[in-house]
Amino acid sequence: MIILPAIDLKEGKCIRLYQGDFKASKVVAEDPIEVALKFKENGAEYIHIVDLDGALTGEIKNLSIISYIIKTINIPVELGGGIRNLNTIDMLIDAGIERVILGTAALNNRGLVEKAVKKYDEKIAIGIDAKNEKVAINGWLNVSSINYIDFAKEMEKIGVRNIIFTDISKDGTLKGPNLDQLKKLNESISCNVIASGGIKDIEDLKVIKEMDVYGAIVGKAIYSGNINLNEAIKIINKESSK
């Protein structure tokens, strides 16, 4: 299982939200480039970045910082937030983004997903953010009537190979992920599933690993000191080699 440390960008700074609430945001680091370098030093093989300004406005706002991070750290980066059209996807892939995450656009524009997957295959991921098992969009401000598993199955039929699943009620809480929903999703589709939201300690990571989940995104637990990234990566890799 791969551990992806998270950087959420707002106005050029690293912040963390609580349950997806932009009003409950807290700056955790002034310099995201320094954070990314620290993640690399601690053994990260992949970094998860969200442009929160982009998620709200529908267009990437922190591209210069993101581009600099890619050039500086030289490890794969996946990016979500405000990616709504093929031109933006093209631009991001050209800029060196390894995997582009579509969220709102995937729900509102199935045609875009089809075109993107046809062109970029596994470089496209779908971010499914759920509230009470329903898919939320537009920076989590609006909740649809679509069940998260039904949506994941639909994406799989299109050819999507990577799904990032977040239970919004758990995100930023350090109260543990929604293991029940994660398990159901992982058993319902054959895509790579990446767990996100609420992961609080190494024990959570071990449980997710046992579910045969492809990856886990860790944010607040690293910034709060609950998880030592270097130690977590070593432990999970050791478990993988058993």
From Swiss-Prot:
GO terms for molecular function: 1-(5-phosphoribosyl)-5-[(5-phosphoribosylamino)methylideneamino]imidazole-4-carboxamide isomerase activity. The keyword DNA damage does not apply. GO terms for biological process: L-histidine biosynthetic process; L-tryptophan biosynthetic process. InterPro entries: Aldolase_TIM, His_biosynth, HisA_bact_arch, Isoase_HisA-like, Isoase_HisA-like_bact, RibuloseP-bd_barrel. The active site is at D8 (proton acceptor), D129 (proton donor). The keyword Cytoplasm applies. Belongs to the HisA/HisF family. This is 1-(5-phosphoribosyl)-5-[(5-phosphoribosylamino)methylideneamino] imidazole-4-carboxamide isomerase. It comes from Clostridium botulinum (strain Langeland / NCTC 10281 / Type F).
